[in-house]
């Protein structure tokens, strides 16, 4: 069988009582699990060109997830607008308990096909997200997945369920 991707690192935690509410994670819990996955994979955030986010388009959850990603990425440098931020939910809707694996499959297929699909229906970023002053970009057009196999890392797949990360 052909191997399309390898999970290099994993981070797991449970933010329990620190959650914003039952349906929204805590910023610190999200940042910790992203940091754990990067450390486990032994890669720098700056080497990652694509993040498959949980991205439910909620007014509370997305800003928390974005702030956690930004907090972690900014520890590695101040480079701006180089990492594509996307979510499979714009393509297929929320798949409930299969949402994490759907995002992971999208990330693997993106790597395999060399294309990052555009975020369909994206028009405006949430007012609580400062995209311009961040490492991230959101695109509504397909983009080539440009990577160098000699880089430390070239993809990050994020399940977003219960503070789980895979690199």
Predicted feature locations:
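Condensing-enzyme catalytic core of the thiolase-fold
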Residues: 1-167
């Amino acid at each position: 069988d052909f191997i399309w991707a390898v999970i290099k690192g994993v981070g797991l935690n449970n933010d329990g009582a620190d959650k914003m509410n039952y349906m929204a994670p805590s910023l610190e819990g999200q940042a910790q699990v992203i940091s754990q996955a990067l450390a486990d994979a032994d890669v720098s955030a700056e080497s990652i060109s694509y993040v498959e986010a949980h991205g439910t388009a909620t007014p509370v959850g997305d800003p928390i997830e974005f702030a956690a990603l930004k907090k972690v990425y900014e520890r590695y440098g101040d480079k701006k607008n180089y990492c594509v931020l996307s979510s499979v939910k714009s393509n297929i809707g929320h798949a409930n308990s299969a949402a994490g694996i759907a995002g992971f499959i999208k990330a693997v297929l993106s790597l395999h096909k060399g294309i990052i699909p555009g975020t369909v229906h994206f028009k405006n970023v949430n007012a609580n997200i400062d995209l311009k002053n961040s490492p991230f970009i959101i695109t509504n057009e397909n983009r080539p997945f440009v990577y160098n196999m000699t880089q430390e890392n070239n993809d990050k797949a994020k399940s977003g369920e219960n503070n789980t990360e895979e690199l």
